Amino acid sequence: MSKVKIKNVNEKTIKEKFWVWCAIISMTVYVVWRIFFTVPDHNIYGWVATICGIFLVAAETISMLEGTEHFTRLRRKSIPEKPVLPLDWFPDVDVFIATHNESADLLYKTVNGCKHMRYPDRKKVHIYLCDDSNRPEVAALARKMGVGYFGMEENKLAKAGNLNHALSLTHSPYVATFDADMIPTREFLMETVPYMFLPRLKQLDDGTWAERSEDEVDEDFKMGFIQTPQSFYNPDLFQFNFYSEKRIPNEQDFFFREINVGRNRANAPIYAGSNTLISREALDEVGGIATGTITEDFETGIKIQAKGYTCYALDKALAHGLAPTDIDSLI
């Protein structure tokens, strides 16, 4: 990662830094007060109360340390410069749209968005509807729109099994994954694919890009995935119920545009399962999408990073979906 030029975006202003330091100082004063003045005296209240008090203070101290680390990480967001890629370098990409019980009308919007993604050679973009419910209407939609269809009779591994089934039937070096409702913008591939070539390219002093020589190539520098924000075109439950669509941001914005991007410096951005471009080599090395867990995306991302792959999160929304509109969908 040291060979990549990093641009720091959204540097905190003096006012913002002032409030951050106020928060850190106040938390420190609070924890010191809790440790020295509020832990129950065992001579008065007994050992059970004292031990419980110590555990509570320890939990609050850990929370404070985590908060301090969080403020430090978000002091500036770090995103690598996007390489300028020769047009003939753009590789084949498989686009997976995972669906379970979503309607054909909803899937139409996503497929339509995928078909309109800009790319130098459109023949290199292979779009597939991955349907683990094997529904005739979804297969008909795929035929109508001229995209591939992978149906499954019995999928006992949920979304992970669905995507792994698609991986076993395709071969492009890169895979873009989308949830059924996530509609990519025209620029999704043009904004994400170039980052996969950071190990092969270098930025010169004049801002142009050139291919690294054999001596300059670091064999250990491999790209794993590029995660873009999950953005929504309708208000979430909180915005809607508090009549605050124009006054408060979607709850996902803070995580995807601040926290996840802030994790770039530690090579720890989280794979969110959608709106992502992933290296097939990385997926093959970790055995595909993780199974046996309800957080297959999170675990898959960690496994890829543990294998030494470099991963980045971007703060630019390149796909937009449908926020949950009821409690059942949210859960």
Segments the model singles out, each with a brief description of its role:
Residues 90, 97-112, 133:
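Active-site beta-to-alpha loop of glycosyltransferases that engages the nucleotide-sugar donor
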Residues 120, 130-138, 154-155:
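A conserved acidic beta->alpha catalytic loop
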Residues 151-168, 172, 186-294, 299, ...:
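Long helical/loop segments within the catalytic core of UDP-sugar-dependent glycosyltransferases
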Residues 110-124, 199:
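Short, acidic, metal-binding catalytic loop of nucleotide-sugar glycosyltransferases
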Residues 175:
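Short aromatic/hydrophobic "clamp" motif used to bind/position activated sugar donors
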Residues 178-183:
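The conserved acidic donor/metal-binding loop of glycosyltransferases
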Residues 1-89, 142:
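N-terminal membrane-anchoring/stem segments of glycan-assembly enzymes
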Residues 91-94, 126, 284, 299:
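Cell-envelope/extracellular polymer assembly enzymes that use nucleotide-activated donors
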